Structure formats: C-alpha cells, structure tokens
Amino acid sequence: MKNYLWNMFTTIKNGQMAKKRVVIGPRKNICESFLKILWNEGFISGYRISSQNPSNVEIFLKYTRTGVPVISSLKFLSKPSQRIHYSSKQIWKLDSSKTFVIFSTNQGLKSINECKKDRVGGEPLIIIN
C-alpha cells in the first residue's frame, strides 16, 4: 500500500521542483483516494485517468500566481520501522490550522478534519505544509 503512496509523493515533489504542470503517477485505489483528498483541500488543480495508459493517473499540480508550489512540503510521519497511532481524543489535540495531516483509518484515508468530524482515530501518514 505505502510503496505506491511513496512513489506518488516523490513524483509530486520532483514535479514541483521541476515546475511541471502535469505529472503521471500509478492508478491505485489508495492513490486515487489520496488525490481526492488533495483536490478537495485545494492542494492540486485536479487529476484524471490517463487516456494513453489507463493504469496511470495524470496529476495537475497547482502553483500560486508567483509560481510558488501550493504544497511546500510533503513528509511521511508514520514509517514501517516506527508506527504511530492516534486515538480520536488525541486527534482533537492536534492543531490543524498550521499543518494538514492525512490519516489512514479503518474507513480509508481521511483528512484531519474528517477524522475529527467522524470521531475516528488512525495512523497519521502524511503532513502537508
């Protein structure tokens, strides 16, 4: 599961460093749910299934008017060697105004705001600034 996400994060990071508008990533359910969260929160312009190769997804990166990437940093928080889990009570203590966190829950990938709304705990995967 996470190998696909790591590949997608690297693709997005490298694409933004190279100032690309479109990058291509693997089309997996976990990757599509991650892209849906990024799109709903305004971190990417959009995504679509590649017309040339249906097993890939085209990701449209978003930049400010000055050309600065909207996503300044993507970091993995929970790693295979060090698992971190938060209960629903611990999630309420996190400050969601400064950073954006995506959690892996028993209901799939959810943003920190969705976890607070649904009162669900989980494993924090990604921190986006």
Task: Mark where each language-model region is.
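Core subunits and conserved enzymes of cellular information-processing
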Residues: 1-129
